UniProtKB/Swiss-Prot annotation:
Cross-referenced PANTHER family: TRANSCRIPTION INITIATION FACTOR IIB, TRANSCRIPTION INITIATION FACTOR IIB-RELATED
Gene3D superfamilies, A to Z: 1.10.472.170, Cyclin-like
Entry annotated with the keyword Metal-binding: yes
Family, as annotated: Belongs to the TFIIB family.
Residues that coordinate or bind Zn(2+): C11, C14, C30, C33
GO biological process, one term: transcription preinitiation complex assembly
Domain of life (superkingdom): Archaea
Residues in Sequence repeats: 124-207, 218-299
Entry keywords, A to Z: Metal-binding, Repeat, Transcription, Transcription regulation, Zinc, Zinc-finger
PROSITE patterns in alphabetical order: TFIIB (PS00782), ZF_TFIIB (PS51134)
The keyword Repeat is annotated on this UniProt entry: yes
Cellular component aspect of the GO annotation: transcription preinitiation complex
Protein name: Transcription initiation factor IIB
Amino acid sequence: MPEQEAFRLRCPVCGSTDIVFNEETGEYVCARCGTIVLDRYVDQGPEWRAFTPEERERRGRTGAPLSPTLHDHGLSTVIDHRDRDALGKRLSPRKRQEVQRLRKWQLRARIQTGMDRNLTIAMNELDRMANLLNLPKQIKEEAAVIYRKAVEKGLVRGRSIESVVAAVIYAACRIHHQPRTLDEIAKKLEVNRKEVARCYRLITKELKLKVPIADAMDHIPRIGEALKLRGDIIEYAMKIMEKIKGHPITAGKDPAGIAAAVIYIAVMQKGERRTQKEIANVAGVTEVTVRNRYKEIMKVLNEMDLEEIEKEVSKK
């Protein structure tokens, strides 16, 4: 590094060791007499800075980043499926046959064991399911890590890959406070709900996953966004949720059902037209659930002052 190099230099004119480095000109200059001690210095170090060993290791690594969502973490190479050479020209029939044969052998080299085959299928399925649910990268990676641990402990054996993948996705969503109900996941991914629930309970128990308790508050932004509600309505619903949080009426109830009922109350108070059926479909619950939770919550809110809640929201 230039700073370290400066300590070893000495001015040939005055003998001073107080040498400074000029980053703009690439010169080492004596701070006492101004003599240029060394010029045209080329810094061989990296152009980035790192403040921790972990950051230095991460930024210093060359090549593509490792990813748990790929069965081999992305370490192996893949022969391009397009039959073209480096200049973009199509290969001759003879060359295409040769490349096809190389692809086959390369695939066999990548997938050698039963675990490799399982992970290849599972990671492809995970990618497909995560795209259907519009999940962010961090949840996909969390789900992939959980699945790998389940494979290592032999929890996948005898169970369908689709059900296990759906279960680890549900667990990853819970861990990252991304509200997704089992019913929603089972419906969108077209898997058996009971089987997914069974796999989820097994995985969380055997892997000792610390999954936070589902919070109805987490469901409100998702439902509000899906219904394209105004920001003030969502904020009003969250204020209502704060008022009833911890109340006995919420104990043992489905968080999605409570959130749906609170959203319904908020849209009614704000004069927005939304039906119970519409809200229930988005929340992944039944109309009956929304109706029952609505009645219970309204009894509690009637003891409070809804206008006071609205004033609190308006002040912000």
